[in-house]
Design a protein with these regions (language model features):
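Carbohydrate-interacting/catalytic domains
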Residues: 8, 13-14, 23-48, 52-192
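Active-site region of glycoside hydrolase catalytic domains
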Residues: 1-2
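Juxtamembrane extracytosolic/periplasmic "stalk" immediately C-terminal to the first targeting helix
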Residues: 18-20
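Conserved strand-to-loop "acid loop" that flanks and positions the catalytic carboxylate
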Residues: 5
């Protein structure tokens, strides 16, 4: 799989990725982070077109350089920080890239919660280490949102597109999230 965000999507009057997002400027930044967080977690090789990492609102133009001056503004600097950190996170976590060419590296937990716009899936490496990915595609805080998990024990949030250092709301789920067998869901014996 190749997941391209090609130049053809951000030129010739089609708008930048930022301008394709709905909502306020803050919601546009959050939408791009959520979309690209999903892309990084999804199986397949990644291709990101230049300028997106800066949060450019203008279309890409081959006759001029990127709008590097945007990095002097806090929201754009935070967006740039997000891209740096998610790339490092991706490289450091082999379940995200080791088996990205077939179904052995991917499994759905929840793919049908269209009312909440949330999807949940698992990614695996060859040793069956795994990461659970939760994507919330709307700017609504999901308190007490439960997901089925494969193992009994403690879970922790290891990356979030909504962390304040990326310009997000700063809502964190933290660590030591204990699974509960009283609430089985999504075909799993426990949930968090």
């Amino acid at each position: 799989f190749v997941l391209p965000i090609s130049h053809d999507e951000v030129v010739h009057g089609k708008c930048s990725l930022m301008n394709k997002m709905p909502g306020t400027a803050e919601q546009k930044f959050a939408g791009v982070r959520a979309f690209l967080g999903y892309m990084m977690a999804h199986p397949g090789k990644k291709l990101l077109f230049m300028g997106t990492e800066l949060g450019q609102f203008i279309e890409w133009n081959y006759e001029q350089e990127l709008d590097w001056l945007l990095l002097q503004y806090p929201q754009h600097a935070a967006q740039h920080r997000f891209f740096k950190e998610i790339n490092h996170f991706y490289l450091e976590n082999s379940p995200l890239w080791e088996i990205d060419f077939n179904w052995d590296g991917f499994s759905w937990i929840s793919s049908d919660d269209c009312e909440q716009s949330v999807i949940v899936f698992r990614r695996f490496n060859k040793e069956k280490d795994e990461i659970i990915i939760v994507c919330n595609f709307v700017p609504v805080e999901r308190e007490q949102y439960r997901i089925g998990v494969p193992y009994d024990g403690a879970y922790e949030e290891v990356f979030s597109t909504d962390w304040s250092r990326f310009g997000g709301s700063g809502i964190e789920n933290g660590s030591n999230i204990i699974s509960e067998k009283e609430f089985p869901m999504h075909g799993m014996e426990q949930s968090i």
